[in-house]
Amino acid sequence: PPPPLFFHADDGIRDRSPSGGLGDVYKRHRLFMDSLCLLSDGVPEVMEFDWEATVKLGLPTGQGFGMSAAGSVSFCNSIQRAIGIPYEEGHRRSLMIAHLVDRKRSSGLGDVTALSAGGVEIRKIPGSPFSGHLLENGPGKSEGWTAEAEIILAWKGEGGKHTSSYIDNPEWRGLISSAGSKNLEELSHKNWNESRWSDIILSSRKFSVESGLSSEKSRSEVLRMCEEAMLEGGMSHSGVALLCMLGTSVAIVPNSLESGLVEVNQVRSLLDDCGLENILTRIGDV
């Protein structure tokens, strides 16, 4: 049997959105227990200890932000560092485990592959970024680049459908896979760098429509609220609202990386007024 695991999961916004219940706690506990059990396959000595872990996430899970993958990676990194495993070896193993957990729980669509690249990422080959006992590269492969640009993330506090409700549904899976493959192919033809920003925005919009995801009432409502806040706040010319997949959430990104977003505080205040949780962040490092 696995060792006792006591944990506290803090999504970083719990004081603003007290919507988490016992079901959320149970799901998170299973996430970390699954991670620990898979970790023990490669590092059996972790089973010799009782563990108490505090996992702090800056965003909610289940909203298309990749927090399940990020939480699993952080958890496995911490456990391995605690028993003296070198960082690079441990981090590779953590990414591999997080990918396996996402597959098992149907909780991600390439989130871990994206995390391994960082920044604005494109997945070239699906699969775990590292594999096998030697933690060699692949089969998954992704590329990323970064830029100095602020982004607003906005979401409904009560959360949306779990990713598994789409991945495990043959009709949804077919629509998402078809739209994703088509738009990914169009993005893969040229070099992956900052010059592709307008292509990314266009493909994101096309994917949300072609997959049918933007037609769901909960998503279209959040998108409408964001676009209205941008118009009223004076941001409609500098930014664009894009759906996050597969949450009930939106990323407000700049039309131009050089110019960035304007009237950020005003728009965030309007998002607060209409009941949307939101946070100001930026494009990540690679």
What do these predicted ranges mean?
Residues 140-203, 207-210:
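Acyltransferase
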Residues 125-126, 132-136, 162-168:
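A short secondary-structure junction signal
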Residues 192-286:
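Glycine-rich, charge-dense phosphate/pyrophosphate-binding loop(s)
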Residues 45-133:
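Gly/Ser-rich oxyanion-binding loop with an adjacent helix/lid
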Residues 105-107, 113-115, 142-148, 233-236, ...:
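Solvent-exposed alpha-helices and their adjacent loops that cap or buttress functional pockets
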Residues 2, 10-26:
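Short, small-residue-biased leader/transition segments that mark boundaries at the very start
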Residues 19, 23-44:
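Glycine-rich, flexible beta-strand/loop modules in the N-terminal catalytic cores of phosphate-handling
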